[in-house]
Amino acid sequence: MHLYYLGPKGTFSYLAAKQFESHEQYDFIPLSNLHEVIQSVSKDKQAVGIVPIENSIEGTINIVADSLAHHDVYAHGEIQLDIDFSLYGHHSNSLDDIHKVYSIAPAISQTINYIHRQQFDYDYVDSTIQSLNMIKDGIGAIAPLGSGETYGYHTLDQHIQDYPHNVTRFLVVKNHTHFIEHPNTTIFLITPKYDKPGLLASVLNTFTLFNINLSWIESRPLKTQLGIYHFYVQADTAINN
């Protein structure tokens, strides 16, 4: 059985996947981007995928929200992971030698104040671990705390995220529904057939009517025309209720 995640080994997705508890034995399959993770799960009945959906600093991970909407996959659980970044560089460099850094877009966003204070230029790669491959004289990488040492790189600075309480929520996804013995939350994707005044309010008021708390609401464009959306709603209730 396969477990797909955004690789390579050492990414936050990998660390979240290591926290995934299951009675099944999974072969870890690293993939190059998050869309590919969800697409692979949708085609593999025996697979599970681990994807980030929300960060306490950045908010919703849009590429994941959009990919979930366009593939037949279902959330079976979630994992919360503390996010801690370090700056890595060439062994001959100090912090003062660095003029540019690389990382994945969410990592850049979550360390942007630090980047500006250091007056670094920055650019993007597809994963935090891939950024380590960009390291050379004067070029650094922003990657998970402890990951750079594994690949033989030098730590230039630690705990560089802009906010100390940085947590990412990951979803455990499969391509089929499955009975969960004691579910306590449900994620809905609501796609209205047409737009009208008060549409979202009427949807949310339905949950209020039944005294159901909502812990996450996110709108994403349908990508058909401007102003037309579907909505993710996470309700603190079991789906069979």
Annotate each language-model stretch with its function:
Residues 1-241:
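Domain-level signature for soluble enzymes in the chorismate/prephenate branch of the shikimate pathway
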